[in-house]
Every structure is written in C-alpha cells, then in structure tokens.
Curated annotation (Swiss-Prot):
The lineage of its organism: Bacteria, Pseudomonadati, Pseudomonadota, Betaproteobacteria, Neisseriales. Pfam families: Ribosomal_L27. The gene is rpmA. The keyword Ribonucleoprotein applies. Keywords: Ribonucleoprotein, Ribosomal protein. PANTHER family: LARGE RIBOSOMAL SUBUNIT PROTEIN BL27M, RIBOSOMAL PROTEIN L27. Transmembrane segments: none annotated. GO terms for cellular component: cytosolic large ribosomal subunit. Gene3D superfamilies: 2.40.50.100. Belongs to the bacterial ribosomal protein bL27 family. SUPFAM superfamilies: Ribosomal L27 protein-like. This is Large ribosomal subunit protein bL27. Residues 1-21 are annotated as: Disordered. One of its GO terms (biological process) is translation.
Length: 90
C-alpha cells in the first residue's frame, strides 16, 4: 500500500498588490482641473505652474489645461505644469 507522510507548509506564497503608479496624463493632453497627472513614490516629478501635490506625492491639475513636462534648474529637476486652456485652441 503506497503512502506518503504529510509535507511541511511553506512560508512563501504571497505578494503585494500592484499600486498602479506612473504617468496618467501625457504632454499636450487636455485635462480638467482635479485630474491626476502622475502617481508616484517620492518626487520623481515636481509640481510646476498650476499643479498641486497630494500627501502621497500625487501630482494633480489645479486648472483646466494642457500638460507640459519640462526640466528646470541646475539639478535638471523634472517638473510638470499646466498651460491654461483658453477655449479658442484646438
């Protein structure tokens, strides 16, 4: 009669859920106020003109407008700004 002793349990087998980080709105994209532009850990991108930063470093639009990515300053920081939407564009 074939038999097998019970195997031990493993301590592995779990993983954390993906956090869906990254750029959500790209350059020259028209977005409404309050839209999330970048979800990030830390300040990979810094807030520029008309952009706010949440407590988890999420960047969001303060006004309706077009997204602009630029590098600024001696440290070449990546900044995200919103160019205002006037209504006469497009």
């Amino acid at each position: 009669m074939a038999s097998k002793k019970a195997g031990g349990s493993t301590r592995n087998g779990r993983d954390s859920e993906a956090k869906r980080l990254g750029v959500k709105a790209y350059g020259n994209e028209l977005i409404p106020a309050g839209s999330i532009i970048v979800r990030q850990r830390g300040t990979k991108f810094h807030a520029g003109d008309n952009v706010g930063m949440g407590k988890d470093h999420t960047l969001f639009a303060k006004i309706d407008g077009y997204v602009e990515f630029k590098t600024k300053g001696a440290l070449n920081r990546k900044t995200v700004s919103i160019r205002p939407y006037t209504g006469s564009e497009e």
